[in-house]
A protein has these predicted regions:
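Residue-level detector of Asp-centered blade-edge/turn motifs that repeat once per structural unit
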Residues: 11, 21, 52-53, 62, ...
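Low-complexity/repetitive intrinsically disordered segments
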Residues: 1-9, 95-104
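Intrinsically disordered, low-complexity repeat/linker tracts enriched for polar/charged residues
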Residues: 6-8, 15, 35, 40-43, ...
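An edge-strand/N-cap motif at the start of beta-rich repeat modules
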Residues: 4-7, 27, 68, 79
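Conserved core positions of repeat-based scaffolds
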Residues: 15-18, 27, 56-59, 68, ...
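Intrinsically disordered, low-complexity proline-rich tandem-repeat tracts
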Residues: 18-19, 39-41, 59-60, 80-82, ...
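Short glycine/serine- and acidic-residue-enriched loop/turn motifs that recur at repeat junctions
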Residues: 29-41, 70-83
Length: 104
């Protein structure tokens, strides 16, 4: 989009995910496993980090929660629930796995 700026980009095997300066995320490329189906945000929420894996995408939200979409053959989009007071601070998607850094 003309006039839209991006703050982060991550390339997977056949898809790319971008973080826009307004806190929304967009993805393009092969969507065979739903890796480009970025979940909509709740009001007042934004994405703060994006990471594209092999056939999945992981996103960090402004409230410290994480969400993922796409291929789940190895459980790579299963995001563990956190105890109260703990949040995710960083996300990274590998070929068939996801790494989530916690605040504790």
């Amino acid at each position: 989009d003309e006039g839209t700026s991006y703050t982060q980009v991550s390339a997977g095997t056949t898809h790319t995910v971008l973080l826009r300066s307004d806190g929304n995320a967009v993805a393009c490329g092969n969507n065979e496993d739903g890796q480009c189906d970025i979940p909509p945000l709740d009001a007042g929420m934004s994405y703060t980090q994006v990471s594209a894996g092999g056939d999945h995408t992981v996103l960090l939200r402004s409230d410290g929660s994480a969400i993922a979409c796409g291929n789940n053959l190895f459980g790579q989009v299963d995001i563990p629930q956190l105890e109260q007071g703990i949040c995710y601070t960083q996300v990274s998607a590998g070929m068939t796995h996801t790494v989530l850094l916690r605040s504790d």
